[in-house]
Amino acid sequence: MLGPIGHLAALAAYGFRRGAQVRHDLDAHRELAWAQAGVAELPRGLEIQWLGTAGFRLSYQGQHLLIDPYLTRLPLGDLLRRRVVRADAARLAALPDPIAILVGHTHFDHALDVPALAARAGCPVYGSRSLAHLMALHDHAERAVVVEPHHPYELGPFTVTFIPSKHAKLAGGLWVPYGGELTCEHVDALTPQAYKCGQVWGLHIAVAGVTIYHQGSCDLIEDALVHRGVDVLLCGISGRRFTARYVNRLLRALAPKLVVPHHFDDFFRPLDAPLTMNLNVNLAGFVDEVGAVSREFAVRTLGLGEAVGGPP
């Protein structure tokens, strides 16, 4: 794995080839489109929707589960100016009321919209102590469930287990930006930088006879991954270059039948803007990395806001 200087050099090289790389990634995204695969990989009645970034909606039997929903998508300028950003209720209106919301960690691109969604739906949210603190800031402390590792939570038709995980060290491979616990003392101080990472969780979900694993950040604790042979791996890929052998280790631990990459989009652009790629995410390269582990792993992509389901 590269050191800090190597990462800086790689970023500089990306700057020169960015246009070509983005086009290559968009081509790969189109070629791997799940809707064009012609294979019904989900059971009847189960639907998966990508909400952009690491966000997903899972629906079964008329009940909905949200994972890391982030539709507000603040502009980059708001991050740089450290502006307090509120959840965009108009954008959140596109989502159905969930029975629960699951949060893998509390960076803004995973947690900013959660209090507003939970308040609207009157549903519980499951995650870390940092998430509970965030909910308390919004006067919804009673809706927060601080989870226990490896404990199965029965949420309607879904059985959810939280798996201890780690966040990629995006700062040149040295540290996690905005790491530590979320300790902000007032909602008026909730700048993007105030959304500290908190405890990181992977999510194992069983529903309709299939298993789904959501990996929201590009690092892992291999000894914690006890669910081998999952049906669908929702695999975050942004920042994986900062974690040694991330793809290899994750795939060998989980042995998924299907891999669905996410967290490769530029999440500073609104959801209704054309898809473009996050900084140096290299989606096409990810496909090669999966193939290097085994050609038996199928890779499928979803478009922003796209939903796929089992046979009618």
Q: What do these predicted regions represent?
A:
Residues 33-40, 60-103, 107, 112-116, ...:
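Pre-active-site segment of Zn-dependent metallo-hydrolases
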Residues 58-61, 155-156, 205-208:
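Active-site beta-strand termini and strand-to-loop segments that position acidic
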Residues 67-70, 97-107, 126-129, 213-218, ...:
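Active-site neighborhood of phospho(di)ester-bond hydrolases with catalytic His/Asp-centered motifs
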Residues 74, 106-112, 132-135, 151-153, ...:
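Active-site environment of divalent metal-dependent phosphoester hydrolases
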Residues 87-175:
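Active-site HxH/HxHxD metal-binding segment of metal-dependent hydrolases
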Residues 94-96, 117-121, 226-229, 250-255:
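Short, conserved loop/helix-junction motifs that constitute active-site signature segments
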Residues 124, 136-152, 248, 252, ...:
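Binuclear metal-ion centers of metallo-dependent hydrolases, dominated by the metallo-beta-lactamase
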Residues 188-253:
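Active-site-proximal loop/helix segments of hydrolase catalytic cores
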